[in-house]
């Protein structure tokens, strides 16, 4: 049971860090290589 509670306390932390990293990476890619769906005249 101790291992299960440890898993429940660490999985959300790892998921939050991973999603933050992925979102930041996508933002930086779209900054340098803009999405062609957005046209800025």
Curated annotation (Swiss-Prot):
It is found in: Plastid, Chloroplast thylakoid membrane. Its main location: plastid. It holds the Pfam family PSI_PsaJ. SUPFAM superfamilies: Subunit IX of photosystem I reaction centre, PsaJ. Keywords: Chloroplast, Membrane, Photosynthesis, Photosystem I, Plastid, Thylakoid, Transmembrane, Transmembrane helix. GO terms for cellular component: chloroplast thylakoid membrane; photosystem I. It is a single-pass membrane protein. May help in the organization of the PsaE and PsaF subunits. This is Photosystem I reaction center subunit IX. It comes from Chlamydomonas reinhardtii. The lineage of its organism: Eukaryota, Viridiplantae, Chlorophyta, core chlorophytes, Chlorophyceae.
